[in-house]
Amino acid sequence: MARVGACLLACLMSAGAFAASGQQLYGTCAACHGARAEGNPGLGAPALAGQHVAYLQRQLLNFRSGLRGSHKDDTYGAQMRAGSQATLPDEKAIAAVATYIAALPRTEVKPAGKFDARNGNNLYQGKCGACHGGQAEGNEALSAPRLAGLDAAYIKRQHRNFGKGLRGAQPQDRYGRQMALMATTLASERDLDDVIGHIHAAGAAR
């Protein structure tokens, strides 16, 4: 019995150290992404709080390896690539900071300005919802990130990056390549605005 208790205590101490490590590592990220990972559109930094752990880990690994952020025209991606390489030395560090971020309270964004709710809903459900969820909550089983909570400028920038080959162009980036194909199906700026409005409205309604 004493041995079981000692093992349990050791596990709890290990979990506590892991969480503390994630929080400490996030300190560098907070300068751009905010103290609670709420994001900062003025710096081009998206909200990260409440995002799926596996997605966060994959993107950080992609930045470190150059699958993301290596295109000469991807300025913000290059910043993230340099930052992740400088502050996250290995996969254990990436797992710790991703776990910490995912546990933070989610950020919601209210729709800004007018948008065609019907068109946004129809387009989102027809093109995005099957993977990203009916309310933009994401789907870990499909490796599709949560979109609710991401600011409009970030979503537009990533849509453009996928469409122009700045992201998702490398053969090894399986999920990025899927999104690069999907980005071509939403070509109109008005349609994109309507979809983003729907994403924000759906996220706020949850």
PLM features per residue range, with description:
Residues 40-47, 64-94, 110-115, 140-146, ...:
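Axial heme c-ligation environment in periplasmic c-type cytochrome domains
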Residues 26-29, 45, 53, 77, ...:
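Disulfide-stabilized extracellular ectodomain repeats and their linkers
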Residues 22, 27-65:
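The feature marks the first
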Residues 119-169, 181:
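A charged, solvent-exposed segment within the mature domains of Sec-exported extracytoplasmic proteins
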Residues 18-38, 112-137:
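Sequence/structural segment immediately N-terminal to covalent heme-attachment motifs in c-type
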Residues 5-16:
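Bacterial N-terminal signal peptides
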Residues 98-122, 206:
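Intrinsic disorder/low-complexity detector
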Residues 53, 57-65, 94-98, 102, ...:
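An amphipathic alpha-helix signature
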